[in-house]
Amino acid sequence: MKKSGRTLKARLYGLKHLSSRLKRARHFRGHGVHSPYVYNIVRKVFMQRELLAERCDLYAALKERGIAERRCVQLQNLVAHCGYEAWGIDRMEECDFIVCTMATAYDHLQPYVDYAREHRLTLCILDPYNNANRWEVCRGIVERHPSTTVDNRAYLLVFNNHLPKQVFVL
């Protein structure tokens, strides 16, 4: 026993989860992501802390709704990186990118997914881990979705384009 009163077992307890943390860090940096499309998103969107686009209208709209600065920057950079022209927040309309904030209840997410799939739009669901009900719905969306999904713990990206069925949890 150490002078602190903690046994060796108590001091090494955190090592139990080390492998999953290392794997997440590895994927977050883009290593182990075998899709060039998603790898570019990880490197050019998730790892950037400053705005890369000249137009920052999505950034301003998300900040106005109380979304964290880092998430606003990432989503604005995603819109610029993917070349999306139009976007919508919490409404189903003809655009390239739809963002569902916490204002969209978990039981209303499935109509957004169906609309995005029908119109081949990209859907972003913010805070998929906020509560158990929201996560259950998001997990079902990922399981049934025919294309690529990217979950970076802050939001879930549901792509409806040329990509094959792949699930990335970063």
Give residue ranges: language-model regions.
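A short alpha-helical cap/connector motif
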Residues: 1-119, 129-170
